[in-house]
């Protein structure tokens, strides 16, 4: 309790430390950053706190509190990811995770299953939409004020391990028990793909993850086989993801040597010019792209490439305005930083990053 109170008491100092010029992270994690006077000053301050402060404090905890403040002073998209959160953050874009294959909402402080993934671990044992989860591995979770993120941590786990669920079902007065073996759960990024008329296919992409291009291409091929000659790509609400997925998708619609995106950074290896290679399967198809104020980053790269090459009709609202490219670097303690390393520009030279 003593250490906890001391850590809280030092939060104002932590915030002040985070504003000191020179990034302390570089001192410890990168040989690219010179040892500036600001970095030496911050290192000395932390050393003095650790050795001379009247009460014992946890320097690691102070540093954990400092790093997010430091990153927040760069730009809106550079961020620190604690080790405890890195797996969940990566899973969202990696295309799969190990879990039980359900989605849920909290209704009256109770986990309520609203979707069971077909063929997933939960469906195999008989869990159904509408089921309410009362216990997880003999721990009461209903009515306990447990937040969604903690429920997710309890349900996810290593592939092949088991979790026991106590379920209440509307047509039963008894608590039903299910042992579910965790398995790989796909994270689909194409929400929908269907014909809206005999010659027009509609595809909705919710994010740009590692599997997005293959999902997207497979959807287009199936729609083309069903008669589609033209397509509507819905990127509304798509906040972005991996830039290379947007580039690969754009390549499917552009003739050879069409500019797709330029990136410009501080270092030479963060600058690039990307052009289509002419191997796209849908170069002759008409395309409409739907965007809104939540379409960002990779969505804007794709839409910008289509617009500046006069390749598609862009319909909707002004997009979000995220023209910064981040690189994720894993640190020795398994935490990570996502650091902005370049700005991207559409083929006509526009950088759509809004002011910050």
Predicted region positions:
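Conserved functional hotspot residues or short segments at active or partner-binding sites
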Residues: 347-356
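Cleft-lining beta-strand/loop regions that shape enzyme active-site pockets
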Residues: 17, 25-38, 46, 50, ...
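An acidic helix/loop motif centered on a single conserved Asp/Glu
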Residues: 57-75
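PDZ/PDZ-like peptide-tail recognition elements
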Residues: 65, 76-115
């Amino acid at each position: 309790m003593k250490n906890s109170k001391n850590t809280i008491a030092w939060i104002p100092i932590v915030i002040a430390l985070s504003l000191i010029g020179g990034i302390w992270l570089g001192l410890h994690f990168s040989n690219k950053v010179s040892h500036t006077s600001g970095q030496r000053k911050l290192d000395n301050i932390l050393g003095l706190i650790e050795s001379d402060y009247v009460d014992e404090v946890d320097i690691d905890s102070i540093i954990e509190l400092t790093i997010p403040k430091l990153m927040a002073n760069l730009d809106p998209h550079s961020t620190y990811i604690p080790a405890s959160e890195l797996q969940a953050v990566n899973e969202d874009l990696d295309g799969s995770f190990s879990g039980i294959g359900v989605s849920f909402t909290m209704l009256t402080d109770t986990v309520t299953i609203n979707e069971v993934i077909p063929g997933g671990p939960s469906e195999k044992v008989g869990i159904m939409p509408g089921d309410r989860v009362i216990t997880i591995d003999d721990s009461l979770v209903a009515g306990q004020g447990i937040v969604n993120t903690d429920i997710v941590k309890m349900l996810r786990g290593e592939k092949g391990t088991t979790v026991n669920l106590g379920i209440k079902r509307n047509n039963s007065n008894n608590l039903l028990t299910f042992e579910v073996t965790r398995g790989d759960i796909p994270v689909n990024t194409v929400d929908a793909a269907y014909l809206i008329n005999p010659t027009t296919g509609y595809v909705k992409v919710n994010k740009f993850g590692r599997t997005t291009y293959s999902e997207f291409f497979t959807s287009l091929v199936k729609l083309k086989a069903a008669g589609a000659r033209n397509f509507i790509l819905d990127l509304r609400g798509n906040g972005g993801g991996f830039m290379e997925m947007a580039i690969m998708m754009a390549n499917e619609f552009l003739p050879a040597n069409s500019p797709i995106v330029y990136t410009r950074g501080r270092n030479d290896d963060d600058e690039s010019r990307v052009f289509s290679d002419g191997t796209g399967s849908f170069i002759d198809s008409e395309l409409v792209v739907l965007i809104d104020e939540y379409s960002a980053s990779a969505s804007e790269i794709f839409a910008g490439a289509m617009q500046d090459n006069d390749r598609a009709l862009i319909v909707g609202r002004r997009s979000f305005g995220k023209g910064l490219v981040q690189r994720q670097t894993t640190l020795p303690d398994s935490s990570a930083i996502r650091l902005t390393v370049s700005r991207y520009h559409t083929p006509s030279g526009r950088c759509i990053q809004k002011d910050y």
